[in-house]
Amino acid sequence: MITASRLVLARKRRGMTVTRLSQLAGITTRRLGDFENGKAKPSPASLTALVGALDFPESFFHADEVADLPPDAVSFRAPSKMTASQRDIALSNGRLARQLQGWIGDRFRLLDPDLPSLTTFSRCRTDSPADIPMPGQTAEGTPPAEEAANLVRARWGLGHTPIANMLHLLEAHGTRVFSLSRDCADVDAFSFWSLGTPFVLLNTSKTAERSRFDAAHELGHLVLHGEEQIPHGPDAEAEAHRFAAALLMPAADVFARAPKNASIEWILTAKRHWRVAAMALAHRLHELGLTTDWQYRTHCVDLGRLGYRKDEPRGLQHESSQVLAKVFGAMRLEGVKMSDVARDLHLHQADLNDLVFGLVVTAQEGGRQPSADPVTNRPRLSLV
């Protein structure tokens, strides 16, 4: 007997419609619909055809239910660019990442989440009063999202210094960070809460600077928009964008360093200080009033001409997960192979690798089987 919801999950993970899968598997759409709704059980021949078309281990379809991840529970970065297929692939990545996190959590004690709840700083939530001043709104009009970023910096002891590694910062405060699969190119990033645990999934095909900003953007969604009644739309995206800019380029540091009417040459040098994209720094200078509208437009044109609109010449190296690297390192010492993890999760190693920043292919396979340590003896991962 197969788990019908896993058949749906596998199909969506591959970005297929019911029609497309029925064509590949040689099964009528009506019959496939019966399989997915649990009204009928596929014959051995039909199951073999589905396994081949979807490229999942057969055991995947017999395992327990995987908790759903509805679109309304997720904050997507730049959702307007997504097709339905890309959204399905992304959400399926999130569900599988949550399964992997459960596997890790059964064997390691990870850091507890330490994200402040700053939902009262959001103007997008339905429970935020619109007729009274927002917390953090100063007489000078500092946007609440910017003030929220300042509070996060203060709580985490960051001061006004640049953030050296955005992924490590998220993980140091209990956020579970995973990577998106390569067939999810149109999704920059997304985040969600699951039973009090924050998750962020990032697209690793973007520039390192873009990924850092996406990670900060998703942190903005997590702290500003909360776990329930998550707001969506342009206003929520604008809030998370302002939060990310303020977190990575705090106003106090920008004002202390940036000249009025900064040149392109200054931007290309200073972006390395904050470890951000040149376009992001140009936008930050403008929103802080350090450049005029005309200067900002000129900067954008000049940076685009130099190749900085979609790329970051001579950019940073990509950040990766410190927690996952430590987990896999500890498993190697115990003789646990990546194939063991994939087997436990009923996945191919390639699908596992997609979730973990490519760390599977760089891990050295151990030889012996792991010992069955009780959960109470799980090693605790601590970040420096």
Task: Identify the role of each PLM range.
Residues 1-384:
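Short juxta-domain linker segments that transition from a proline/glycine-rich
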